[in-house]
């Protein structure tokens, strides 16, 4: 995904997920290869070069998963993805709405009256987290601030928004921002 700027494996969620996956795979007598890809088409080419039992895909979009499924015969699992039509796709994901709801409820119970949620987009899983947060916190009392994905434009955006920091006591990051 473009937000990783070529540093996908430095993302804490992805690296910790790979660590857990590799432990499980190895405990079952298999091994794991890791291949970064900027475009989903690269996965098809890579998969055709090896005799693989299966593949785990992270970080692409719904249309990419659908295209992959139509071009690949080996089983594959989407890890924490957003699949609108999961036919023949196994999607291992968390309940993003409920996770957001729990965080929102927790902040409300702590007595906070306003919250600023920060994300680099307002679609898919991040949208679900924000919607859950609003439902748990208080509808209309949370604002979503969408920041640029790329590092330099993001820093410029932050500098331009510094005057707003006093408006909010808590900053709830919907996603891990890679700075």
Regions found by a protein language model. Give the residues of each.
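Bacterial carbohydrate/catabolite-sensing allosteric modules
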Residues: 2-3, 15-31, 41-45, 53-56, ...
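A conserved, positively charged/aromatic
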Residues: 49
């Amino acid at each position: 995904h473009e937000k990783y700027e070529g540093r996908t494996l430095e993302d804490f969620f992805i690296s910790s997920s790979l660590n857990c996956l590799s432990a499980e795979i190895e405990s079952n007598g298999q091994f794991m290869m890791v291949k970064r890809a900027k475009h989903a088409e690269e996965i098809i080419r890579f998969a055709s070069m090896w005799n693989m039992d299966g593949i785990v895909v992270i970080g692409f979009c719904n249309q990419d998963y659908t295209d992959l499924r139509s071009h690949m015969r080996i089983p594959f699992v989407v890890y924490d993805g957003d699949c609108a039509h999961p036919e023949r796709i196994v999607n291992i994901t968390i309940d993003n709405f409920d996770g957001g709801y729990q965080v929102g409820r927790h902040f409300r119970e702590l007595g906070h009256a306003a919250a600023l949620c920060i994300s680099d987009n307002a679609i898919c899983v991040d949208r679900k987290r924000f919607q859950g947060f609003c439902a748990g916190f208080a509808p209309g009392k949370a604002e979503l601030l969408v920041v640029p994905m790329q590092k330099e434009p993001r820093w410029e955006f932050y500098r331009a928004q510094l005057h707003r920091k006093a408006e909010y006591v808590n900053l709830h990051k919907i996603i891990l921002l890679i700075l």
